[in-house]
């Protein structure tokens, strides 16, 4: 399907029937760009020569939680390796089959492949919301409960895997409502809840509560299967201004250690998240707010 989409883009940007054989001559290529599509010349040429794709991932953390696997640990590492080994092997098999049916990409003639590049881990927060609120891309959940605002109104989004665990505790309806209010008032965290055991608290840690070294480690492990790049975001909780200097020093050292580790393990990082992108509404406290939109790169958003 993706190869069809790519071909549709190429055919709408250039007149391939007139261009004839694959050409490496960019000036000759420019002559056959369709009227009104001049702005797409370079990207169409790249697509025409490489036919690169960017298969990614979505719901990594959601799957771990559904299987009761903490994000931090060797079980998550094992699934991470298994999942991306599978994706890469199937993608490689598919591009070879397409090459035999439709031909190779010109820039990699003789490789037996239809596409020069296959995988790229892009952010897809919007798609995650559409797909039943699953976790975006390879990222951990920012909160277990938050208010999602749309043009048609606001509604509360709850972590469905946490909801299942809470319902198994035998709570009454009013008690369950109070627990969710408590979670909302704690910025989506469950670490303070006595009703959950230590393992359950580990499973439902939010992005800012995780040791960021594990995000880097998972990304490092899967990089061998990703021929392009990963959008790797890191999440940090700034200490309050009233905290002692030692706390601030430890925070800065932690941030430095994570980035130093990332520099040695990864070829790039994406966003440095120091505050929640989607603020959790504390229904018990009325606080004046300024609406600050969380900006994403539209070009690479899934």
Name the predicted role of every residue range.
Residues 41, 54-56, 70-72, 122, ...:
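Generic, ordered loop/turn and secondary-structure boundary motif
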Residues 290-302:
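Short acidic, low-complexity intrinsically disordered linear motifs used
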Residues 1-44, 48, 64-124, 197-203, ...:
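Internal maturation/activation junctions in enzymes
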Residues 2-29, 33-34, 119-288, 301:
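Catalytic alpha/beta core of large soluble enzyme barrels
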Residues 48-58, 74, 78, 82, ...:
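Conserved active-site and cofactor/substrate-binding residues in soluble primary-metabolism enzymes
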Residues 51-66, 116, 129:
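Contiguous, well-ordered alpha-helical segments that form the cores/surfaces of helical PPI scaffolds
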Residues 54-59, 103, 137, 188:
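Glycine-centered small-residue hotspots that permit tight backbone geometry or close packing
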């Amino acid at each position: 399907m993706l190869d069809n989409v790519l071909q549709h883009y190429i055919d709408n940007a250039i007149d391939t029937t007139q261009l004839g054989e694959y050409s490496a001559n960019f000036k000759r290529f420019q002559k056959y760009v369709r009227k009104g599509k001049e702005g797409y010349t370079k990207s169409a040429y790249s697509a025409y020569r490489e036919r690169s794709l960017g298969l990614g991932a979505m719901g990594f953390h959601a799957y771990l939680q559904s299987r009761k696997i903490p994000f931090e640990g060797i079980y998550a590492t094992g699934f991470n390796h298994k999942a991306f080994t599978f994706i890469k092997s199937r993608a490689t098999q598919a591009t070879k089959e397409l090459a035999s049916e439709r031909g190779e990409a010109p820039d990699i003639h003789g490789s037996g492949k239809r596409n020069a590049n296959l995988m790229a881990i892009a952010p897809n927060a919007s798609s995650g919301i559409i797909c039943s609120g699953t976790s975006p891309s390879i990222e951990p959940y920012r909160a277990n409960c938050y208010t999602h605002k749309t043009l048609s109104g606001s509604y509360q989004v709850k972590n469905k895997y946490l909801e299942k665990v809470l319902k198994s505790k035998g709570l009454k309806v009013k008690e369950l409502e109070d627990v969710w209010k408590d979670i909302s008032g704690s910025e989506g965290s469950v670490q303070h809840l006595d009703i959950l055991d230590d393992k359950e608290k580990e499973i439902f840690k939010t992005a800012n509560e995780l040791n960021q070294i594990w995000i880097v480690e998972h990304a490092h492990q899967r990089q061998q299967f990703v021929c392009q790049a990963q959008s790797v975001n890191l999440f940090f909780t700034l200490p309050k201004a009233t905290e002692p200097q030692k706390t601030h020093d430890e925070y800065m050292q932690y941030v430095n250690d994570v980035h130093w580790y990332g520099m040695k393990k990864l070829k790039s990082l994406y966003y440095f998240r120091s505050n929640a992108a989607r603020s959790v509404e504390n229904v018990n406290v009325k606080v004046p707010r300024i609406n600050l939109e969380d900006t994403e790169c539209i070009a690479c958003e899934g």
